[in-house]
Amino acid sequence: MGDLARLPLLEKAPTTHAGLLAWVEEVAELTQPDRIHWVDGTEEEYTRLTGELVEAGTLTRLNPELFPNSFAAFSDPADVARVEEQTFICSENQRDAGFTNNWMAPAEMKQKLRGLFAGSMRGRTMYVIPFVMGHLDAEDPKFGVEITDSAYVVASMRIMANIGTEVLDKITATNAFFVPALHSLGAPLAPGQADVAWPCNPDKWIVHFPEERSIWSFGSGYGGNALLGKKCYALRIASVMARDEGWLAEHMLILKLTSPEKKSYYMSAAFPSACGKTNLALLDPTIEGWEVETLGDDITWMRIGKEGELRATNPEAGLFGVAPGTGWGTNPNAMRAIAKGHSIFTNVALTDDGGVWWEGMTEETPAHLTDWQGNSWTPDSDKPAAHPNSRFCTPISQIDMLAEEYYSPEGVELSAILFGGRRKTTVPLVTQARSWTNGIFMGSTLSSETTAAAAGQVGVLRRDPMAMLPFIGYDAGDYLKHWISVSGKANPERLPHIFLVNWFRRTADGDFAWPGFGDNARVLKWAIERIEGKADAIETPIGFVPAGHALDLTGLDLTHAHVEDAVRVDREEWDAELASIEEWYAKFGDSLPEALRAELDALKERMADHS
């Protein structure tokens, strides 16, 4: 083992998995850590690591009376979000990465990365984190091992995934395949050099090698760049595995809706960021007798079941939510889960009594805070107290409304799939697709107007197919073909119905056309009644929308005319929309599925007859 005589922990490795041992040895030789620690996932280990992080200044321990066993971290201001421009899909063939991804030849990228990782863990501990996405006792568990030099990553991964000794034992016992996920902060320490609270490197690379199912992440300690089980594995690499193995890995929530008659239905829903995905996952219905429970708020893996049905599971163990806008008024269920503690907050503000705060958390703004950069803050300050992309990392088990089916390895049968964007005009409140392929067309053209939070021009349309634009691990046209192909593998009678929703439509005078939040349960109720063949709908060129009387408006100060306005299909608006879709589809070139081109042509014909 040559240079590894100084790494005695490798000799005492708690596994005999030859492939894993060889990889750990290779990484240790490359990165030169001072020591290796195999993560066991225990509470004792978590307590020790978080204690060390508090001593190092990386974590601040919160007031245990307010947030038990919870911590706040504050990142380098240059390390606050996913770095899409430095995220690469290095497929062997450039065509397989497609127009939505950055690409570099794998050999060239590996050479670059080896140069960056050489000696990158000097002076640090190398942590080996065995993890499984989803259930350890699933029929086909999806394993990963993350190597990192960040104890903050270890602590966060303990919340977000199933990690530790039990997972490693199963990887070893079954000689299982695992996704190797290598992460380094890129901040080696020379002997005697003082560390900083948030080590990182200005040169950041988040790289995926789809054919070999591997991930290399360098330079960032933040969220989706560093917790490699999340977007990197569960979406980018898993979407490629799903294509090859006949399933789907999607950026979706899963909810359970139970009617007054105690009949339950399961839905998944895809929304781009800032469109209310977590709020819908944790919905409090405003209609009597209907109940919502959640199975997940961000990632859904879907497989075809034994009877041709589409079954969904959530591969994650935690919530990694955007904090600003999550509040007692808008999402009390999320707040109740967070209030139980056992959470790590990143780039939020601190209250004077040792709690946390962010914009939108409470109606009243505290008179004084310490902002995410450590400055004294008052409501007169000209900058937000919490970073707009600040996060809470909380165990999903703390959600009171967590459905028991979350724990089932078989998952749940989906009755409906929702796609939703943020549009002031054009797109109705809710539209039922005519068919599976028509629903894929809706998903493929999903769009949102950019908000002030996004860089660039406000109000510009951003197409985001299935809300997966930053996460598709291969060519986007092939991805849409794969979605269409599911109908050929499934029982057509058991396929979920697809709906397009838009909670953000405005009236002519600029008000929201629909109250949203808990009242969105009324739209879900209509969708279920459509599936059951009970609710009335009006056929439009784009699909079926509710008849004015078909939405349950009990207790709302709305009329059937309001509903008719919220679902109106305007010919002029759609002429502009069709031109915009043409531009979008042109970007796919010859990888656009013929079936979607046919859907667009058919929609144009129907629209031509629409007054």
Swiss-Prot record:
Co-factor note (free text): Binds 1 Mn(2+) ion per subunit.
Question: Which biological pathway?
Answer: Carbohydrate biosynthesis; gluconeogenesis
PROSITE patterns per UniProt: PEPCK_GTP
| Example GO biological process | response to lipid
Subcellular localization(s) per the UniProt record: Cytoplasm
Positions of Mn(2+) binding: K231, H251, D298
How is this protein annotated for GO cellular component? cytosol
EC class of the enzyme, as a word: lyase
From the UniProt record, list the reaction(s) this protein catalyses: oxaloacetate + GTP = phosphoenolpyruvate + GDP + CO2
Residues of the active site: C275
Q: Which residues bind substrate?
A: R82, Y222, G223, G224, S273, N389, S390, R391
- Report the principal subcellular site: cytoplasm
Q: Which domain of life is it from?
A: Bacteria
InterPro entries listed in its UniProt record: PEP_carboxykin_GTP_CS (IPR018091), PEP_carboxykinase_C (IPR013035), PEP_carboxykinase_GTP (IPR008209), PEP_carboxykinase_GTP_C (IPR035077), PEP_carboxykinase_GTP_N (IPR035078), PEP_carboxykinase_N (IPR008210)
Q: Its Gene Ontology molecular function terms?
A: GTP binding; manganese ion binding; phosphoenolpyruvate carboxykinase (GTP) activity
Q: List membrane-spanning regions.
A: none
| Chain residues that bind GTP | A274, C275, G276, K277, T278, N279, R391, R422, F517, G518, D519, N520
- What UniProt keywords are attached to this protein's entry? Cytoplasm, Decarboxylase, Gluconeogenesis, GTP-binding, Lyase, Manganese, Metal-binding, Nucleotide-binding
Give the matching PANTHER family.
PHOSPHOENOLPYRUVATE CARBOXYKINASE, PHOSPHOENOLPYRUVATE CARBOXYKINASE [GTP]-RELATED
- State the protein's purpose: Catalyzes the conversion of oxaloacetate (OAA) to phosphoenolpyruvate (PEP), the rate-limiting step in the metabolic pathway that produces glucose from lactate and other precursors derived from the citric acid cycle.
Protein name from the UniProt record? Phosphoenolpyruvate carboxykinase [GTP]
